[in-house]
Amino acid sequence: MVDITDFFKKTNKADSSQAFNQVRINIASPEQIRSWSYGEVTKPETINYRTFKPEKDGLFCAKIFGPVKDYECLCGKYKRMKYRGIVCEKCGVEVTTSKVRRERMGHIELASPIAHIWFVRSLPSRISILLDMNLKDLERVIYFEAYIVMDPGLSPLHKGDLLTEEMLQQAQNEYGEDNFIVGIGAEAIRTLLAELDLKSLRNALQEEVNNVINSDFKRKKILRRLKLIEDFIGSGNKPEWMIVTVLPIIPPELRPLVMLDAGRFASSDLNELYRRLINRNNRLKYLKKEEDGVPGIVLRNEQRMVQLSADTLFDNGKRGKAVKNSNKRPFKSLSDMLKGKQGRFRQNLLGKRVDYSGRSVIVVGPELKLHQCGLPKQMALELFKPFVYAELERCGIATTIKAAKRIVELGTPDVWNALAKVIKHHPVLLNRAPTLHCLSIQAFEPVLIEDKAIQLHPLVCTAFNADFDGDQMAVHVPLSTEAQLEARVLMMSTNNILSPANGRPIIVPDKDIVLGLYYLTLSIDGEIGEGRLFGSMAEIHHALFNKVVSLHSKIKFRKHIINADGDKVMALVNTTPGRLMLGELLPDGDNISFDVVNKVMTKKGISAIVDMVYRYYGQKATVVFADKLMKLGFKYACISGISFGMDDMIVPETKSKHVNDTLLEVQEFERQYSEGLITSGEKYNKVIDAWSRYTDRVANDMMKGIAAGDQTSVGLTNQERLNSIFMMADSEARSSVTQIKQLIGSKGLIAKASGEIIDRPILSNFCEGLTVFECFIGIPGTRKGLADTAVKTKVSGHLSRKLSESAHGYFVKREDCGTTNGLIITAVVEGGVIVVTLAEQVLGRVAVSNVYCPITKVLILQQGEMIDEYKVELINTAGINSIKVRSVLTCELQEGVCAKCYGRDLSTGKLVAIGTAVGIVAAQSIGEPGTQLTMRTFHIGGAATRGVEASSFEAIVDGRVKIINPNFVVNSNNKSVIMSRSCEVILADNVGQEITRYKAQYGSILLVTDGQEVTKGTSLVAWDPYAMPIVTEKSGYVMFKDMIDGVSVKDIIDESTGIVNRVIIEPKQGRGEVVLRPRICLLDQNKQPLTLSNGLEAEYFLPVNSILSVEEGANVSAGDILARIPREFAGTKDITGGLPRVIELFEARKPKNHAVIAEIDGCVKFGKDYKSKRRLILQPNDECQEPIEYILPKGRHVTVNEGDVVKKGDMLIEGSPVLQDILKVMGVEALGLYIINEIQAVYRLQGVKIDNKHIEVIITRMLQKVEITDSGDSNFVIEEKVNKREVINTNKKLKVKGLREAQYRPILQGITKASLQTQSFISAASFQETTRVLTEAAIAGKVDKLEGLKENVIVGQTIPAGTGFYINEIKKIARQRDKEIIAAKDAELQENNTEA
């Protein structure tokens, strides 16, 4: 452990005794400050303006802080190294290096104590809590506005009472001057703090907290004070040290004074702040020495001035207005030097400027190999200069470094030869900003080029997210052998084949390469040489050369294939010469079937091939294959001559028909609206959906049209008829259906700046041209897209930073933790469609237990086995629906995670290595797509993308229906209306194995019966997507209750139609009036209330905004709709809409209009209502449990009725559930699965794939704290939030001693809070709220064990991840071995001494 000031001192790496592994921060005592100091600064002067030498005893004094020049005293008497260590008797300066001016500190002896503003103003104010005072009262004492009673003596005053000048005069007159003692200023506060007996105060508070029962506020206040006292006792700090009597002065080199032209100086603001303080302090000292006596008011004013100048020095602007300089800019105080982006932490310690680096524009280098980059000669010479000098000297071309320098300046051929030798096998690092993930920095072998731009291999563009429209990249040279080795082994572009985010290949061909391969693998009817038979590739090349066949001719080829029995046989294959040329590139072997390349190649297909080559043949073969693929793609992209032409833009003929059909639909909705059948909101949603369907239909016809090619021109070959635009879109090389739809279909629906969709689409396309009106409504959406790019990129970037901050200290620490817990993984189903298969989710995970085939009972997976591609195929074949796998969330390691719980390292495809920084990888994987997708918005130009609202579930395969909880009634239209809130429709195969299940919502129509056999596409359940119905269970007559016009119900007249809708409103009631609960009651023919199946009256409560569908007195049948609750209008679905949801989840914020969930299984009852709240009581099934009462807002729709049976976790009010509630009720696993599904839904919408384990890592960091519910015999305070690891370790010690253990419950924190409350105060301080974090840490005397990445970077040590992890492990083993050897030697010596 080291003192924090030792950071100023240079550590000698060779001397291991100076190395440290933890750092403690404390409040400095006056004695400690004096021990740091090399002398007292008594003068405010800096340097002499004539001699430019530091003034003696001033802020730059050479006697105190050290010599200005190396080994030279100020007066010049002693010069050079031979006098090292001598103190000049004339000027008093020690002869040493000038670097000591960066380390040596001075001090000021204050004439009057001052309160440190961090302990006064940093909320909560530590001094005010400790003295149990109000902050305003404390400030009045410190700033000499009021006196405080320190000892009441014989007077009736109390200790701590505040007295103004008048009150003091009155008290002195009444009780006498000597009968009580008062004080003022920081000195009085210091005395009060020094008088505190912390241990007895702690005992008194512990008793007091046990006696407080009713007041929650009072209890929290006592606990806060108790926690602070515990911190002081534990750290050894004394409370009076928060009042400063000796002020340290930081070394002069850290607050420089720089000479500019024309004799002017630029000075750090700190010098001015110190100068003001010294002047005031000196004046106060002088006033105190005056024998005549200075009036008290003058003295107090001067003391206040000293306090104010100290406040400005510590934290300018913390209290009142910031003090400004002559340029009207606030002075930069010590606090400002630390915090923010320009502060010491983020500017100088975490982000340093790098030597041996350069930057230039990038251009494409298609002739490079994957591991190479083109480096301009001049740039390379500048970067590798020292190496070139050494090479010239070694070869005997230059005798000295000076001579080598001259030769390099001349630029002789020897220099270039030396440079070529030097850079051979010396990798360089290329970095493209923004560095969003680890693939933004990769290593390459440089190839010297004559240009002035860096050449980049096309296949790494995806990883760097680079294009060649003016992008720049930085080059860095790894200097040491270790750095070069790491660059080559870990960072080489050939090692970065798979994406760490999802495990898919990232060096996949793109753009023109894909287009070339697509063209090459096309199969066209009627081409020359169709039907010919070939036996070898030589024949194919010969035939192509002689133009006997074309690339696209349908031919037969004799080839070895693997048959169904797994035997190698010769067979004739129907293919094309182009596909055979692609197949020729595959590595030798039979692992990849020719069928994989015997089809038209799109981007997805090519990616699949690269993936297969990597899995079956390894890294080297993949790199070679990718390079060959790229060259082939470029070649045929060039030969194809595919280009973008006006004639390729064919507007679909059916467009006008689709427009007319949709207009008729819209007119029908207008009619329904004008007749009052639907509301304005429902009409809006239906119109939006109609136009969404229209654009989809036009897009389909458009793609069919351009796929058919040019059928009108005469004399064209089939190849010439191909449509270039279709080929670009179909191959996924360039453009997308969305963009082509705007060109030759319809631009479609447009979003307003607010995100709401305009219900009138742009029917024209860019090929036909827009009307003035269409252009006008299209402009805001386009501009919004561009504005979003700027605004949302910042939001996404901040999310990335917060994620990294919360997870940077999370590594793989062990091979296996031995847990038997895990997550049960099933396929993700949305609207009855499997969007993510089980196989995709479990790939690369480790099985918790043995998995058997449900039919044959054959063992498929063993416990502890990793699920690879082969096992995934077996799982699919066996039809398994769920598997329990190891998860980061359930890992039982106290620190970090074990390799088995993490599973596969997605960037290598193997089990994760110990020491991998999985936290950082997770943060980058989640943050990077967010940034990318916000930047992608502007390519679509404001067109709104919104999926049509689902209104039914359809069978995804043939099967048999099974209905669970089938509570339904048959309505007047002979339809089965579901009345249960827990009804589920299960689709099973012929064997009875469940394929998928659908949760049928209340009020939906059941279209099938239990046990019915259905075919694929059959509708199972249907519902109204725009409104939630309130349905009657019984037939009867309607009676309204508590519906008073203008009070609880309102007639809303639609201005455009004149239709009146009766809408429930928030009842306007005064105090003491009867509470109104608008509801519909059902009566029988005798006007008596009907009873439901649960024995209660048939009453249906109506929430605010529900629209009545029946009139009073109407006769209704069971299953009829009484009222409708409109759903919200839909906005656009894109990442800018989704990112706030992701942030809301990661920050664990409470959603607006959140859901309320049932905490236990039980029966619903409604209690007596409050004025604006409803009381719901959940009667538990278990009689041992207490009923739970929920107070619900009246306006919200309660999804349950009286007598309903609910399960734990069911929603009582609709909305997004609060994450903390899920954790409390359902546990960690349920919380994890909910967050994963919600976040994946946002990214899935954009086609981004992120592995679940990355989200799991972040959730684990959010769950690292627990709340103490019972402190037992520990030092923890009840309701204190502590690190889980700390509690477990404490409990272990208590258990050994036979004492009571502390009880706790898990709590969920947002990533920002988790980052600020991390174990490392250095990491937290460098993130946000620097002053608050350091204040807290200093009081508690926190120890930073330097376990994360940031804290090690800040203190300049090797990070404990990757290579650093193994170095640390080797050092640990070596230390242990040394201890054992020393212990053995000691024992041997002792034995020898005994014998002697």
From Swiss-Prot:
**EC number(s) for this protein?**
2.7.7.6
The UniProt entry, under Gene3D superfamilies, shows: 1.10.132.30, 1.10.150.390, 1.10.1790.20, 1.10.40.90, 2.40.40.20, 2.40.50.100, RNA polymerase II, clamp domain, RNA polymerase Rpb1, domain 3
Q: Which cofactor does it need?
A: Mg(2+); Zn(2+)
| Name the UniProt record assigns to this protein | DNA-directed RNA polymerase subunit beta'
NCBIfam families, sorted: rpoC_TIGR
**Which Pfam families does the record cross-reference, listed alphabetically?**
RNA_pol_Rpb1_1 (PF04997), RNA_pol_Rpb1_2 (PF00623), RNA_pol_Rpb1_3 (PF04983), RNA_pol_Rpb1_4 (PF05000), RNA_pol_Rpb1_5 (PF04998)
Q: Which residues bind Mg(2+)?
A: 467, 469, 471
A GO CC annotation given for this chain: DNA-directed RNA polymerase complex
- Subunit composition and interactions: The RNAP catalytic core consists of 2 alpha, 1 beta, 1 beta' and 1 omega subunit. When a sigma factor is associated with the core the holoenzyme is formed, which can initiate transcription.
Cofactor binding comment, as recorded: Binds 1 Mg(2+) ion per subunit.
**Summary of the function given for this chain in its UniProt record:** DNA-dependent RNA polymerase catalyzes the transcription of DNA into RNA using the four ribonucleoside triphosphates as substrates.
Q: Which UniProt keywords apply?
A: DNA-directed RNA polymerase, Magnesium, Metal-binding, Nucleotidyltransferase, Transcription, Transferase, Zinc
